[in-house]
């Protein structure tokens, strides 16, 4: 006999008191901490518990009794469905206040180290249309909104291009307007969608692995250049013809596109790192500019997605490094060498290390394009490349700049940094929690001298943080 499912409680007239991880807010009911999406501190709501553990629960708001005085009206029609921009219900001034608190709480609670006064967070000048890259997914499993489901109508058009629905990997929400990228992105996506509808193109099915149209990537830059990459599954010659007809339509409709590319992808996933990118029209790259430096960006290249704030972030890192032109700098997790090249004019020599070989090739190209001859780049796993032997061979760094992934630095990397004993360490992080853990491991030899949070992603809970450490006397 099947076990009867336990009925979860309805919590009435609960006041939301704070923000929490992953863009959620929280309330406390007796000793129970309740995490709730799409509410803000000050809201008074009825909460339907969806999942309950001993000391915490997850719930959704089913009724609002009072709206918080700081609540903002979300500006996007897709808010609350697509899974992005979860903090649109908070004014931007409140968002950055909570991001500042997130950095402070993590450094104190996890790091448990002596801290200077944390500098005020550096907010983003642009809070809409700030991204330079978006990817959209094609699917024949369009997500139906609650209103559409209630109408109990059989819809003829179930193809969609947009964003994956959280928790429903094969469903895609049809996006009409996204506020993250310049509006040309919306125009291109919608034009491709309409053309595909009109000409009966097949959209990909993630479960059956059938269908032609798979993915669309659009990149913009401050130089005005524009890249569009269409990813398709091609099993018949006729489908290749259909794809090229679509690309020809895009080229004619949007002559401002400077790089029109395509990828044939017959794999089970959408990653293109191991696939050949073909040029349909224009160049295979676009450029981004920063302080007179030009950075070449291909379809596979990594570049910070908020160009304006990336510049501010890099300036903070460079200022913290305190370069005089005499220093040997190690740039760890260098990516395409953006920071390495950005600080090279103020350093004697910069050595960049990165896991992805293609990114290192981009870094070398970017040095060459800008006439920079004092950089060296190495590809490989950081813990395997950055060793005591490597340091003995290349020299002890005066400054280390490190910008690791969200997981932070491997223990072996931290131990090698401690062996290298640079005078200063500049730690750039996209995850203050793992940064705090790493800082505690460096604390015996290094003191935190400055902390600068930077908001790269308005309307999300994500925050970057830059920390300067100096060797203890």
Predicted regions and their residues:
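Short, aliphatic-rich beta-strand segments
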Residues: 218, 224-233, 294-298
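Rossmann-like S-adenosyl-L-methionine
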Residues: 2-13, 18-23, 237-473
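Internal alpha/beta scaffold segment
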Residues: 170-206, 210-214, 234-261
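Short, solvent-exposed loop/turn elements at beta->coil junctions and helix N-caps
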Residues: 119-126, 206, 213-215, 453-456
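Terminal RNA-binding accessory module
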Residues: 1-78, 376, 383-384
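Short, acidic/hydrophobic/Gly-rich beta-strand patch recurrent on exposed beta strands
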Residues: 25-30, 162-165, 229-231, 363
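Extended interfacial segments that mediate partner engagement and assembly in macromolecular machines
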Residues: 63-74, 80-202
């Amino acid at each position: 006999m099947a076990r009867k499912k336990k009925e979860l409680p309805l919590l009435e007239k609960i006041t939301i008191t704070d923000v929490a991880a992953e863009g959620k807010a929280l309330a406390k009911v007796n000793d129970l901490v309740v995490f709730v999406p799409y509410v803000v501190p000050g809201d008074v709501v009825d909460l339907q518990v969806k999942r309950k553990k001993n000391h915490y629960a997850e719930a959704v708001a089913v009724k609002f009794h009072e709206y918080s005085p700081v609540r903002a009206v979300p500006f996007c029609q897709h808010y609350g469905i697509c899974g992005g921009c979860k903090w649109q219900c908070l004014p931007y001034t409140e968002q950055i206040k909570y991001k500042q608190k997130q950095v402070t709480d993590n450094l104190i609670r996890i790091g448990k180290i002596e801290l200077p006064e944390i500098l005020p967070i550096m907010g983003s000048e642009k809070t809409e249309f700030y991204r330079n890259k978006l990817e959209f997914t094609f699917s024949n499993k369009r997500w139906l909104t609650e209103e559409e489901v209630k109408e109990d109508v059989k819809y003829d058009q179930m193809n969609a291009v947009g964003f994956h629905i959280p928790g429903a990997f094969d469903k895609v929400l049809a996006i009409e307007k996204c506020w993250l990228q310049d509006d040309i992105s919306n125009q291109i996506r919608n034009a491709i969608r309409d053309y595909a509808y009109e000409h009966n193109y097949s959209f990909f099915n993630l479960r059956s692995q059938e269908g032609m149209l798979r993915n669309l990537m659009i990149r913009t830059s401050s130089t005005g250049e524009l890249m569009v990459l269409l990813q398709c599954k091609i099993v018949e010659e006729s489908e290749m013809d259909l794809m090229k007809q679509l690309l020809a339509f895009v080229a004619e409709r949007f002559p401002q596109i400077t790089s029109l590319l395509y990828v044939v992808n017959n794999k089970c996933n959408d990653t293109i790192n191991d696939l050949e990118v073909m040029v349909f029209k224009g160049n295979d790259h676009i450029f981004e500019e920063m302080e007179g430096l030009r950075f070449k960006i291909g379809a596979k290249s990594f570049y910070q997605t908020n160009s304006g704030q990336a510049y501010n972030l890099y300036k903070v890192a460079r200022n913290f490094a305190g370069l005089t032109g005499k220093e040997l700098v190690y740039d760890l997790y260098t990516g395409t060498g953006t920071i390495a090249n950005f600080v090279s004019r103020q350093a004697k020599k910069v050595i960049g290390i990165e896991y992805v070989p293609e990114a290192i090739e981009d870094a070398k190209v970017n040095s060459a394009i800008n006439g920079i001859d004092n950089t060296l780049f190495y590809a490989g796993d950081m813990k395997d490349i950055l060793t005591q032997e490597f340091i003995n061979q290349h020299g002890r760094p005066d400054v280390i700049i490190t910008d690791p992934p969200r997981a932070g630095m491997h223990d072996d990397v931290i131990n090698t940094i401690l062996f290298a004993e640079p005078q200063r360490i500049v730690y750039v992080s996209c995850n203050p929690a793992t940064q705090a853990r790493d800082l505690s491991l460096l604390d015996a030899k290094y003191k935190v001298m400055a902390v600068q949070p930077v908001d790269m992603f308005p309307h999300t809970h994500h925050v970057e943080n830059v920390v300067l450490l100096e060797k203890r006397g």
